[in-house]
Amino acid sequence: MSGGVYGGDEVGALVFDIGSFSVRAGYAGEDCPKADFPTTVGLLAAEEGGGLELEGEKEKKGKIFHIDTNALHVPRDGAEVMSPLKNGMIEDWECFRAILDHTYSKHVKSEPNLHPVLMSEAPWNTRAKREKLTELMFEQYNIPAFFLCKTAVLTAFANGRSTGLVLDSGATHTTAIPVHDGYVLQQGIVKSPLAGDFISMQCRELFQEMAIDIIPPYMIAAKEPVREGAPPNWKKKEKLPQVSKSWHNYMCNEVIQDFQASVLQVSDSPYDEQVAAQMPTVHYEMPNGYNTDYGAERLRIPEGLFDPSNVKGLSGNTMLGVGHVVTTSIGMCDIDIRPGLYGSVIVTGGNTLLQGFTDRLNRELSQKTPPSMRLKLIASNSTMERKFSPWIGGSILASLGTFQQMWISKQEYEEGGKQCVERKCP
């Protein structure tokens, strides 16, 4: 291996895509990630004394992290939930390392020093954080080669494009990111906090208005079937530990997220009371057995994504709806490349899986697109590709023969220090 260049397919590179909602990791060249688990981890401040290391738990100086769906779902005394990310960037490094350790030991089941690593990062990631991550991977995990790539670029690659406007609507934010020839155009990034978590908040308010209790499954010992709209008949578990508020909240959110995915739908034209009242209702049963039909509210809640003006409780309400986010972003780019952006608007992120999301977006954009431009929306039909697109893009990229000279090799890192990430990873 002269000069530390790897051969495309036999590298066995790993691809990590760590988002605010879930962690996706696996081998390059495969079509979907091996691991897909919540980024949120349970944190227990351990008492002094011998703690046995259990499945999915990592112990660090008096802290126990509960990672992965199973470990996180066990109710425990005083376990808080936390996330290593803030605004899409790594904030809590200790927690981040616990997630990496878990991924290596339980999902990849291999030693870190055998595999080059390609990681995705937020397009607005800071230089200091990029350097710290590079240092962490080479020093602590001793990996042979490393590369950092912006999520939007990977998403474009996953959809067979090197130029396009990536509209990414995830848990914490919705962003429009222009990509040109595989580079992110920083000046055109537009972010809006109206995304999956915002919709969850709206659902929570709906349940409060309708006086529906959200009871997460962990509290329920037994339930009886009841008539539609009748008060639920369920038994609470007897010996429940004193769970923390943050953990209980997290479990409630899981119920809400299921409701979101099953019931909500984006109206294909701006929301109208009369039209919404005519829509077919959807039946949904809460974990405690309470069940009822949802009609107009199915359309009213997601409307806030596209038209924030009628959402109550948004301060000053200068927020941009999804359609505006796209047009504003394209408007901030050079006039010569706009046709290429309008010609491939790539839709990605778990929140875009709401029924009717792309139809509505298409409709809004066709009204806003200048007549001289051709508009094309690229939205994969498979749930998996939309949720995992940055990962899939990374998997494609890291297994390309032509990419192999792009890696930062361990040798380069040792000679050039952590600054080399700024030079080698755009």
Swiss-Prot record:
Phenotype upon knockout is:
Mice have lethal defects in neuronal development, including defects in activity-dependent dendritic outgrowth.
As recorded in UniProt, coiled-coil segments are: none
This protein's major location comes to: nucleus
**Induction comment from the UniProt entry of this chain:** By retinoic acid of P19 embryonic carcinoma stem cells induced by this treatment to differentiate into neuronal cells.
Which CDD domains does this chain map to? ASKHA_NBD_Arp4_ACTL6-like (cd13395)
Gene Ontology CC annotations of this record: bBAF complex; brahma complex; chromatin; GBAF complex; kinetochore; nBAF complex; nuclear matrix; nucleus
Q: Where is this region: Essential for mediating its function in dendritic development?
A: 39-82
Its tissue distribution reads: Restricted to the brain and peripheral nervous tissue (at protein level). Present in virtually all neurons in the cerebral neocortex (layers II-VI), hippocampus (CA1-CA3 region and dentate gyrus), cerebellum (molecular, granular and Purkinje cell layers), spinal cord (dorsally and ventrally), dorsal root ganglion, retina and the olfactory bulb (mitral and granule cell layers). Expressed specifically in postmitotic neurons (at protein level).
Any Pfam family matching the protein? Actin
Q: State its location(s).
A: Nucleus
Q: Which GO terms describe its biological process?
A: chromatin organization; chromatin remodeling; dendrite development; negative regulation of cell differentiation; nervous system development; neuron maturation; positive regulation of cell differentiation; positive regulation of cell population proliferation
Say if the entry is tagged with keyword Transcription regulation.
yes
Sorted alphabetically, which keywords does the UniProt record give? Chromatin regulator, Neurogenesis, Nucleus, Transcription, Transcription regulation
Per UniProt, subunit arrangement is:
Component of the multiprotein chromatin-remodeling complexes SWI/SNF: SWI/SNF-A (BAF), SWI/SNF-B (PBAF) and related complexes. The canonical complex contains a catalytic subunit (either SMARCA4/BRG1/BAF190A or SMARCA2/BRM/BAF190B) and at least SMARCE1, ACTL6A/BAF53, SMARCC1/BAF155, SMARCC2/BAF170, and SMARCB1/SNF5/BAF47. Other subunits specific to each of the complexes may also be present permitting several possible combinations developmentally and tissue specific.
Q: What is the purpose of this protein?
A: Involved in transcriptional activation and repression of select genes by chromatin remodeling (alteration of DNA-nucleosome topology). Component of SWI/SNF chromatin remodeling complexes that carry out key enzymatic activities, changing chromatin structure by altering DNA-histone contacts within a nucleosome in an ATP-dependent manner. Belongs to the neuron-specific chromatin remodeling complex (nBAF complex), as such plays a role in remodeling mononucleosomes in an ATP-dependent fashion, and is required for postmitotic neural development and dendritic outgrowth.
The entry assigns this protein to a family as follows:
Belongs to the actin family.
Q: What is this protein called?
A: Actin-like protein 6B
Protein species of origin: Mus musculus (Mouse)
